[in-house]
Amino acid sequence: NLLNETREDFLKHNSHPTAFTKEIPWKKGDILVQKELAQTLKLIQKQGEKAFYEGKNAQLLVSEMKRGNGIITLEDLKNYKTKERKALQFDYKNHEIVSMPLPSSGGILLAQMLKMSSFENLEKYQQNSPEAVQVMVEAERRAFADRAEFMGDPDFIEDKTQMLISEEYLKNRWENFSFEKATPSAEVGKIIAQPKESTETTHISIIDKFGNAVAVTTTLNGLYGSKVVVKGGGYFLNNEMDDFSVKPGVPNMFGAVGGEANKIEPNKRMLSSMTPTIVLKNGKPYIVVGTPGG
């Protein structure tokens, strides 16, 4: 049970009782009651986003940050604004794919991997055959090398999305592919790291009887984020700073490598790998998909 496994972390990082620890271990059938979180959500329901970024809750959040020597201020919270961006759309085998744009790398990676793998006509290979697996792995290697080198918050870097998903660019990227051997890492990209599996993040895909489709991916980054629960607020503080490139070329907690494009800067949004995606067929939702880990 994850709550039991992380009990010591909750006790270590919180000076106050939280809903996530008990005197005895959690067992199947136990009910997790989060009263403080319920009050916070009711407040947001009544007052909207202002209830979170200003007023009582903002005071609680900043107080919690100060306890951990954090630097977020009331002014930081008040000045924060969500930003709507146009979805990334591209065609693939008579389907229209709608996915997430920068500052998530997910949509670009999906487009790159689908287009590069199509150069080898995967349909002629049996599912999970060595040939099919090699094509997919090599497409992923090239895409993630581009992620490390080119991708970040488009408010801070040049947005090279259209170049990265163009037919001409991807054919050039695929030119050194061979079934005879794995492409040497030095030929795949400049910034390479070992892969690492993760179990964090939540995704939901919904389609209703009217044909409305929603794909939502949400995360705290690590398991339970920073494991710090805001006293009086009942919610976790995330540890999304790790999604920035703290040191170019060095992998983060998930093994993802970043470069200068994703370095830490004030007011910058970190690069993620979220890939909530809707596939359209003849203009109507056909598949709604997404996954933890991007």
Give, region by region, the residue ranges found by the protein language model.
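Short, small/polar residue-rich loop motifs at catalytic or cofactor-binding pockets
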Residues: 84, 198-201, 223, 272-274
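Noncatalytic scaffold domains of N-terminal-nucleophile
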Residues: 1-54, 58-101, 105, 165-166, ...
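N-terminal accessory/precursor segments of enzymes
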Residues: 1, 101-121, 266-294
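Internal maturation/activation junctions in enzymes
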Residues: 119-220, 233, 248-249, 256-257
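Active-site-proximal alpha-helical segments within enzyme catalytic domains
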Residues: 35-43, 115-116, 207-216
